[in-house]
Swiss-Prot record:
Coiled coil residues, start to end: none
PANTHER family: TETRAACYLDISACCHARIDE 4'-KINASE, TETRAACYLDISACCHARIDE 4'-KINASE, MITOCHONDRIAL-RELATED
The protein's role, per its UniProt record: Transfers the gamma-phosphate of ATP to the 4'-position of a tetraacyldisaccharide 1-phosphate intermediate (termed DS-1-P) to form tetraacyldisaccharide 1,4'-bis-phosphate (lipid IVA).
Annotated GO MF terms: ATP binding; tetraacyldisaccharide 4'-kinase activity
Catalytic reaction annotation: a lipid A disaccharide + ATP = a lipid IVA + ADP + H(+)
CC per GO annotation: plasma membrane
Alphabetic keyword roster: ATP-binding, Kinase, Lipid A biosynthesis, Lipid biosynthesis, Lipid metabolism, Nucleotide-binding, Transferase
Protein name from the UniProt record: Tetraacyldisaccharide 4'-kinase
HAMAP family: LpxK
Amino acid sequence: MKLATPRWWYERDRRSMPMTRALLTPLSWAWAGVTARRIARARPLDAGAPVICVGNLTMGGAGKTPVVREIARRLGGHVLSRGYGGSLAGPVRVDPAVHASGEVGDEPLMLARDLPVWVSRDRLAGARAAAAAGARVVVMDDGHQNPSVKKALSLVVVDGETRNGEWPFGDGRVFPAGPMREPLAAGLARADAAVILLPADLAAPDPELVRVLSKVPVLIARLEPEGPPPVGPQVAFAGIGKPWKFERALKAAGCELVEFAPFPDHYAYDAAALALLADRAAQDGAGLLTTEKDWIRLPPAWRERVRPWPVRAVFQDEAALDAVVGGL
């Protein structure tokens, strides 16, 4: 059973869930210690091609995959993913005509529709397979805390949503008492740049967030929808790191949202869950709407009945992006 991301993780105010935070804090110390030792003891090995890591400092929901897609498109690179949720250990090149999300994971299958994508639980083996297949550069989706591969460049993606008491790092505590994969200072010390990914309706990043990240170059990008939401009433659903972000984006774009159903990240939709959503939509004569990542996980018969709402990362200053990644 997969659990949904606790929303209180991303509340900057420690007054929310104080007992839970306190009880989980010793486990956070252990998690942080194990992560630090693993990184310190590792000896990264060369993959045979430059590797750009696009990673997270938090447990998910920052918008990393759209940034991976944009950088890989820009550089003509191959994407490397662990293939979370997939059954194949790899290395294997993803073929959308052959593979299903249950084999290679949802994000790799989604990206493979227009990019060369590899999945491998062994990141080094996957990067070397991509290099052997002719990859000029490998863009690694996630892996900032994975020290096995020598990285030419490490970018960390940070959620730029800071309204309504949200903060991308919560109160700074490490998993499971908070959203951090490791302490902020430790993660930033290994980064070459940070990407603040803003929601489409937020004009500029919080100056305090820019200041916190200022020890590395900071790039600004915006998560822009590829088109308006469908006309008419919609029942929307999402099983992503922060499903409430999808709901908020739809409302900001003017979607006539009659109901929103959140699911855990990478949720495997079955016929029963989808039938309930379809019944709810039928009550209001509504359409069914989801994210591109969720849509790729749907059983093929349901893809005709549900519309995806794709988004892409648009960088505010493309010259600044080229200055960071263009030398590879």
